[in-house]
């Protein structure tokens, strides 16, 4: 049994309401892969693609490039991002914003990452680097929006793509979407690191314990966590206000339900 089937059966047993299949969201209908079709780009292939991009950008510096790719202990993704920084001041700015997101949370996806005219290799991997920084900084909304705008198969590290997407979806209480991302991480990426698959399973098991009732206190607590997180990031705008309205509404409904139960038992 593939992990896809196992998680589907487990999801149904846990009452996640995913049915007998896990179709991808409409935005991901193109370029779908199945069981083990995706892999991290090898260092040699990653270096070749990065070199071609840097030369096309007209910023190729052999010594600087070789220094980046001589670091065998550094991931292909990180060496790719370092190459982007050599060839694009805009990429350097975007990555710095992602790294600094815990201090100053970005409030929108950078324009370069939304520009479909950009080279797909450059845009997808820069988006992944930016989103990874945002996930680490707990800026989940923009992290998810960034990843939704690109395809995993255009990245040099599809496992990182699905992992950080699942983390953001889990944090934003998008249970079905998070399950789909975990399925693709474990089932579709042949060389997904153990740390990603292990954490993916932990996330899945956590969601299996979520209650269906929106008025359940644990579900309300998750909304409160998101509200508190956004306020701590100085993001008290409409999205935060909408979350707070949901909290008040669900607490009010819970109180009414408890009052009705008390009357019925009187």
Predicted segment positions?
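N-terminal secretory signal peptides that target proteins for export/translocation
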Residues: 1-5
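Bacterial N-terminal signal peptides
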Residues: 9-19
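Sec/Tat signal peptide C-region and signal peptidase I cleavage site
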Residues: 18-27
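General helical structural elements
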Residues: 8-9, 169
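Mature extracytoplasmic or organellar-lumen-exposed domains after removal of signal/transit peptides
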Residues: 26-160, 164-266
